[in-house]
Every structure is written in structure tokens, then in C-alpha cells.
Amino acid sequence: MAALVLLRAGLARPRGVPTALLRGTLLRHSAVLTAAADRSAPARQSHGGAPQGHGSSKAASLHWTSERAVSALLLGLLPAAYLYPGPAVDYSLAAALTLHGHWGLGQVITDYVHGDTPIKVANTGLYVLSAITFTGLCYFNYYDVGICKAVAMLWSI
């Protein structure tokens, strides 16, 4: 579809095809393309979240960058947990795993839950689940052996 839009705008053309040959074809099919674009526009608008603007674009970019940073942090924390187990790595893992899971499940909610009330209920449930997860991992780190030692004990079985 993007190639057709570029062809119609005159920004691209297939190799070896003169522009004069494309003009007649594009003029005949422009009404069909416009009608198809109009039919698909409501579907695109209803699937997205916030309207596209500079503010939402910047926030989305920052959120995406934060997700990648947490994923990269997890890649570094896993070997660190094996090589240097301790409370600092345990609590860092608790925070990073909870945040990574929260953002991942948030994307599942965004993709598969529709309607105002179900979205609010699902997001509230997600925040409760994330808070319980983080609290449980911190409790486990403080009162028990910690995440690193627990994984090492599982590996020794």
C-alpha cells in the first residue's frame, strides 16, 4: 500500500517504466485507492491510542527507549546475579523484572482489551499485580535467601 501511495504522489516509480505510462494507470485507479484509504481510515483510528501529535510522539519515544533500557539492564543483571550474588543485585532484579513484566502485560492489554470500562479494570488489575509482584520479591529478598541464591539452589538440584 505504501508503494502505491508513493507511486501516486510521483515520488517513486518502478525501474524501466516511463512516467507517461504510469500517469494513465494512476489516474484511473486513484478513485479506487482513495475509496480504499477512506474505508480503512476508521479502523486505523479506532485501533490506536492517543491521537498523533508531537507530545504523544515524544512520550511514546521516551517510553520505548525506557523499555529497551530495562531490557538491556536485564541482560546485564542476569550474569551479574550469577557472578556477584547479593542484596543489591537481588533488589535490582526485583525492580527490573517487575517493570519489564508490567510493561509487557500493559502492551497485551493495549492490544487485546477494548472498551473504556474493561481497559480501566484491566489496567487497575495490572497495577495491583505489579505492586504485589514487587512487594513479594522484596519480601523474598529480605526475609528469605533472595532471588540470586534461590536460582542457584534450583540449579544445584
From Swiss-Prot:
GO cellular component, one term: mitochondrial inner membrane
Annotated pathway: Carbohydrate metabolism; tricarboxylic acid cycle
Record keywords, A-Z: Electron transport, Heme, Iron, Membrane, Metal-binding, Mitochondrion, Mitochondrion inner membrane, Transit peptide, Transmembrane, Transmembrane helix, Transport, Tricarboxylic acid cycle
Swiss-Prot/TrEMBL GO biological process terms: mitochondrial electron transport, succinate to ubiquinone; tricarboxylic acid cycle
SUPFAM superfamilies: Fumarate reductase respiratory complex transmembrane subunits
A Pfam family that the UniProt record links to this protein: CybS
Ligand binding (heme b): H100
Mitochondrial intermembrane side: 84-88, 141-157
InterPro entries per UniProt: CybS, SQR/QFR_C/D
Presequence boundaries: 1-45
Residues that hold a ubiquinone according to the record: Y112
Described purpose of this protein according to its UniProt entry: Membrane-anchoring subunit of succinate dehydrogenase (SDH) that is involved in complex II of the mitochondrial electron transport chain and is responsible for transferring electrons from succinate to ubiquinone (coenzyme Q). SDH also oxidizes malate to the non-canonical enol form of oxaloacetate, enol-oxaloacetate. Enol-oxaloacetate, which is a potent inhibitor of the succinate dehydrogenase activity, is further isomerized into keto-oxaloacetate.
Subunit structure: Component of complex II composed of four subunits: the flavoprotein (FP) SDHA, iron-sulfur protein (IP) SDHB, and a cytochrome b560 composed of SDHC and SDHD.
Designated name of the protein: Succinate dehydrogenase [ubiquinone] cytochrome b small subunit, mitochondrial
